[in-house]
Regions:
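Double-stranded beta-helix
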Residues: 129-181, 185-187
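Transition-metal
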Residues: 1-83, 218-227, 249-257
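Short, compositionally biased
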Residues: 151, 193-204
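Conserved short histidine dyad/triad with adjacent acidic residue
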Residues: 106-120, 138-143
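A gly/proline- and charged-residue-enriched helix-loop-helix capping module
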Residues: 74-107
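A short beta-loop-beta micro-motif enriched in histidine and acidic residues
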Residues: 115-125, 167-168
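A generic "binding-loop/recognition-motif" signal
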Residues: 112, 122, 186, 196
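Conserved double-stranded beta-helix
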Residues: 171-172, 202, 206-257
Length: 257
């Protein structure tokens, strides 16, 4: 679903502002790689540059990199920006899905021609194009079994990348001021245009998406034990038991801290 926005000139989304934010964020909240990649790639095969994150951001026009700044809401200014955006859609989400939780923001900074390989993300996501152009290719899983195994991997502690191209992709050609809504877990890949790209991703969870994530996480554990777990949605009572188990494990981890 296409959307529009008015953030193209926002001072917090300039390359220099993003570079300064990259220098402030914890090291594990900034990720990058050299982005001359195919649409499907082993995450262990990507290369990185041995430079500070701020310099990678400032030199994005010529270093061939892709960078993501995660959980930008940990910075007060960016949290205000995130909340301003999500507050506009929160009433509709509350009416349709029962509430909006886990508000998070991500900034993507991409060199000309870079590729973000096929992957999935667990959140409801509005991707807003701020600078440059890109093609967002959103598809589907080829079959139910592939979907189950991929999501168990991603939500059970594995990588978000998938080892196949999304089936029947729909391409969204994004210009500054454009955006697209991406449903949780929808497989997609991204081709950047001929200029530096800046994109803001504003994400959230709902009760239903939280439940699905937790069932997949428990299913991943069950599969490692040699079992063949039932996918979310087929047996609601069993799903409720898995969610209760996930929540109980979270409480145990909290007590151990």
């Amino acid at each position: 679903m296409g959307v529009g926005h008015s953030l193209t000139q926002h001072p917090l989304l300039s390359v220099e502002a993003i570079a300064r934010l990259a220098e402030r964020l914890p090291e594990d909240r900034v990720e990058h790689n050299v982005a001359d990649l195919p649409k499907v790639v082993d995450p262990n095969a990507v290369r990185q540059r041995d430079e500070p994150p701020g310099e990678i951001a400032r030199n994005i026009e010529r270093n061939g990199c892709w960078m993501v700044l995660k959980n930008i809401e940990s910075d007060a200014d960016y949290k205000r920006l995130l909340d301003e955006c999500l507050d506009e859609v929160a009433p509709y989400v509350r009416e349709r899905d029962g509430g909006m939780t886990e508000r998070e923001g991500f900034i993507f900074l991409s060199a000309p021609g870079s590729v973000t390989p096929s992957h999935t993300d667990p959140e409801h996501n509005f991707l807003l194009q701020v600078r440059g152009t890109k093609q967002m290719n959103v598809g589907r899983f080829p079959d139910t079994e592939t979907e189950q195994l991929a999501l168990e991997q991603a939500l059970g502690g594995g990588h978000r990348n998938v080892n196949w191209e999304p089936a029947d992709p729909v391409t969204f050609a994004l210009q500054p001021g454009d955006g697209v809504y991406v449903h949780p877990h929808a497989p997609h890949w991204v081709q950047n245009g001929p200029e530096v790209s800046v994109s803001l991703s504003i994400t959230f969870a709902t009760p239903a998406s939280q439940k699905t994530r937790r069932v997949h996480a428990i299913n991943a554990r069950l599969r490692r034990l040699g079992l063949s777990p039932t996918p979310p949605g087929r047996r609601p009572r069993l799903d409720r038991g898995k969610v209760a188990g996930f929540n109980a494990m979270g409480r145990v981890r909290a007590l151990k801290r």
